[in-house]
């Protein structure tokens, strides 16, 4: 069995008492879970438009939480050219403590490299990969995704880690992603630069829809 917790931390304006309660909850959750992914709502302020209402901000925070769950599930359940199964996920996440998730999206020339780089420098990620113990890497694109591009994206992630990092990756082709490349990384055992390790959202891929996928607004910058 594998137990993964994905939680949000309060906005700063919600007060110190609520934050203290949340930190105590996260600490207790770490004792019961193999891995805990923490989403700091405060970081959302850096990527949301200033005109975003408070109600919409809380909805987005909740949606990020949902996307975090969906992202991990998709790594296992989405059929791929190079599959990532439950055993792979368990290898990376079992007993891993705190984890982060990053996602990058790109189109056009050099899209694979750009998507991988964006996954690493996402505004919701504030950490380095040099001390990572494990990385789950998912590369997705349309029917035009080439083996060369898969290699390019994987090389960006490998170069940001070390030879001791256990990297497991999968590659998926989805016709709705024509012209796009998405790179998702789930990283465990990473040294923090202060605060909880954050997670970036992954756009849900609904099997009921044939419409092209649109990335969240802050991924399109």
Predicted regions and their residues:
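Tubulin/FtsZ superfamily GTPase core signature
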Residues: 1-221
């Amino acid at each position: 069995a594998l137990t993964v917790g994905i939680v949000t931390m309060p906005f700063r304006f919600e007060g110190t008492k609520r934050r203290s309660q949340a930190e105590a909850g996260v600490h207790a959750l770490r004792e019961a879970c193999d891995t805990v992914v923490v989403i700091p709502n405060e970081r959302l302020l850096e990527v949301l438009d200033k005109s975003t209402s408070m109600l919409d901000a809380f909805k987005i925070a909740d949606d990020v939480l949902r996307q975090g769950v969906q992202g991990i599930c998709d790594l296992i359940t989405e059929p791929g050219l190079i599959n990532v199964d439950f055993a792979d996920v368990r290898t990376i996440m079992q007993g891993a403590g705190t984890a982060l998730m990053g996602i990058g999206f790109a189109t056009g020339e050099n899209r694979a490299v750009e998507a991988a780089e964006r996954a690493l420098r996402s505004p919701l990620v504030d950490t380095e990969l040099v001390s990572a113990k494990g990385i789950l890497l998912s590369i997705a694109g349309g029917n035009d995704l080439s083996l060369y591009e898969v290699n390019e994206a994987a090389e960006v992630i490998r170069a940001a880690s070390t030879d001791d990092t256990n990297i497991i990756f999968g590659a998926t082709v989805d016709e709705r992603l024509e012209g796009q490349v998405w790179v998702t990384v789930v990283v465990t055992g990473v040294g923090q630069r202060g605060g909880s390790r954050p997670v970036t959202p992954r756009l849900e891929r609904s099997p009921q829809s044939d419409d092209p996928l649109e990335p969240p607004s802050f991924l399109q910058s």
